[in-house]
């Protein structure tokens, strides 16, 4: 019976890892966890090797696309935005080392900075939110603040502009600013749910060490 379970485990793991390769990142975290925690060493080794292949492909494409983003042409802004959108799903999973995660997040915002300087109107609120979240995860509060402010300036009527600032201030331990933004959100015409206004919703974020 255990062999049957092992085969099923390996089959489901293979399916999940293939999802990662195809770019379906919704199931990738489950695949990665399964890879690292599988009791079957063969399965764990197989999954880990597939994951490394995925990450190596990611690093290679990041390098290529980064150079593409430096080319001054009509597609430069679009290339920069596509670069951010490509990087986000992998960075979101936080499967890189802390050092590489931080380096990649920095490169992500560097490229978006280029797009912002050239034609910021083309940057969507969703892209602003992505770069804010990735910078927050690596505790780059200074650059995260910069992008949160830009998001609020360009999209003052969008919920994510407020929630990005709230997450930032909560993580920094800036309680007064956190509740100030929350009150501004309450006073706005933006449709919100109760969860957004509950401080407990932010407790999963990393608090500053004292």
Please identify what each model-predicted range represents.
Residues 3, 25-35, 60-64, 145-146:
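Amphipathic alpha-helical scaffolding segments comprising HEAT/armadillo-like alpha-solenoid repeats
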Residues 12-23, 34, 45-53, 133:
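Structural detector for internal amphipathic alpha-helices that build alpha-solenoid repeat scaffolds
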Residues 1-8, 202-209:
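Conserved small/polar residues in nucleotide/adenosyl-binding loops
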Residues 120-123, 156, 190:
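Short coil turns that delineate tetratricopeptide repeat
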Residues 74-94, 125-130:
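Amphipathic alpha-helical repeat scaffolds of TPR domains
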